[in-house]
Amino acid sequence: MKKRFERIFLIVMDSVGIGEAPDAKEFGDEGANTLGSIAEAFNGLHVPELEKLGLGKIAPLKGVKNVPTPLASYGIMQEASLGKDTMTGHWEIMGLHITKPFQVFPDGFPTELLEQLKSETGRGIIGNKVASGTEILDELGEEHVKTGDLIVYTSADSVLQIAAHEEVVPLEELYDICEKARKLTLAPEYMVGRVIARPFVGEPGKWKRTANRHDYALKPFGRTVMNTLEDAGLASIALGKISDIYDGEGVTKAVRTTSNEDGMDKLAEQINTSFEGLCFLNLVDFDALYGHRRDVIGYGEAIMAFDQRLGEILPQLGDEDLLIVTADHGNDPTHTGTDHTREYVPLLVYNKGIKPVNLGKRRTFADIGATVADNFQVERPSNGTSFLTELKPE
C-alpha cells in the first residue's frame, strides 16, 4: 500500500500548553494555561493563521475565533509520561513513555553530588544555582579565572552545566570532567537529562562562550519512530534542539538553529528540498526566553511572530506534505515559580487535500509517533494510536 504523505513536517512549539492537565494538581500546576493566560494578558491574541487552522476550536482563547470550517484537523493531547520536561515530552512524541521523571534542581545540586565531583576532578565548585549562562559568567567568571574553581549551574530543565575558561581549564580536561559528571548523575537519585560543557574565553566584562560546547545527553530509553525511519532508509531531519534531545539517535541530518526565526528559515529551506520522511523542528525561544523568565509580553509577541511565519510556510507545502503543529509541555508565564507546567498541548494537522476533523482528546503524545510510523509503513511504537485513518480526503 502506498504511503499517504511523502513528507511530514512536525513543529514543536516548545512549552505552548493549552490548559491544565487532569493530573496538574500532582505537579503543583492547578490553573496553569499557557496560551489562555497569554491571550488574557494581551486582551486577545492576534494569530490569524493558527485561527484559520482551528486553534480556537481546541479551547476558548481570548481574541481567537472558533471558525466554523478550519483548514486543519484539531485536537488536544495529554502527556502519559511522569514528567513535564523537554526530553520527556519529545521522547513521548516519538513513541516512548517515561515512568521515572528526570530530576530538576531549582535549589541547586545536592552537596553529596558536588563533593563527589570535587573529589573526582580535584577542582572546587562555585555557583550551584539556577542561572542564565551569560549572567553567571558576569557574576563568577573573574573568581573562576583566579581560583580555577568550576562554575556549576542549572536551569529549569534537567541539566547540569559546567562553565570553564579555555585558558584556565583546557578543553580536554573540561570534557573529561563532564564525562565524570555524566557518570555520577546516572544514579537514580540524581537522574539528570543532560550534562553540558560550557567553555568560554575573554576577560571580565567581555566573556564570550565558544563553539566548543559539548552535550552529554542520555540516549532515549528505547527505540523511537526516528530509529525505524532511519532503518527504512527514510529521512529523519532534526532542526534546532531535536538532535540533542534524542542524543542523535535516529537522526539522518541535523541542522542547528539560533532562534525561532532561524528555525522557521531552516524549515522553509527543507520544504524546498527534495526528501522522503520526517522533518522535525523544535522552537525553543517560547520556553527558554519567555516561559522560564515569566515574560508574558515577550511570549505573546513570539507566538504572534510565529503565526506570521506560519502564514508564509503554509502555501509552500505540497499536495503530499503533512504539517503537524504541537507542543511538549506547558510553561505558563503567569504561573508561580519558573518551572514548566503540566498541561494539555494543542494538536493541529494540516494538508490541503484532507477534510478537517476533530481528533478529540488524545491520551498520549505518542499518537503523533504512531501516525508518522503508520504513514511511512514502518514499525509502530508500542505506545500511541495512529490518527492517520481519521484524516480523510476532501
From Swiss-Prot:
Subcellular compartments: Cytoplasm
Any GO CC annotation of this UniProt entry: cytosol
Entry binding sites for Mn(2+) 1: D14, D328, H329
BP terms from Gene Ontology: 2-deoxyribose 1-phosphate catabolic process; 5-phosphoribose 1-diphosphate biosynthetic process; metabolic compound salvage; nucleotide metabolic process
Pfam families xrefs: Metalloenzyme (PF01676)
Coiled coil: none
InterPro entries registered for this protein in UniProt: Alkaline_phosphatase_core_sf, DeoB, Metalloenzyme, Phosphopentomutase_DeoB_cap_sf
Disulfide-bonded cysteines: none
Record organism: Shouchella clausii (strain KSM-K16)
Reaction(s) catalysed by this chain's protein: 2-deoxy-alpha-D-ribose 1-phosphate = 2-deoxy-D-ribose 5-phosphate; alpha-D-ribose 1-phosphate = D-ribose 5-phosphate
Alphabetical keyword list: Cytoplasm, Isomerase, Manganese, Metal-binding
Pathway the protein takes part in: Carbohydrate degradation; 2-deoxy-D-ribose 1-phosphate degradation; D-glyceraldehyde 3-phosphate and acetaldehyde from 2-deoxy-alpha-D-ribose 1-phosphate: step 1/2
Single Gene Ontology MF annotation: manganese ion binding
Cofactor binding comment, as recorded: Binds 2 manganese ions.
The gene coding this protein: deoB
Cofactor entry: Mn(2+)
Function: Isomerase that catalyzes the conversion of deoxy-ribose 1-phosphate (dRib-1-P) and ribose 1-phosphate (Rib-1-P) to deoxy-ribose 5-phosphate (dRib-5-P) and ribose 5-phosphate (Rib-5-P), respectively.
Top-rank EC class of the record's enzyme: isomerase
Name of protein: Phosphopentomutase
Binding sites annotated in the UniProt record for Mn(2+) 2: D287, H292, H340
EC assignment: 5.4.2.7
Family, similarity comment: Belongs to the phosphopentomutase family.
NCBIfam families linked: deoB (TIGR01696), PRK05362.1 (NF003766)
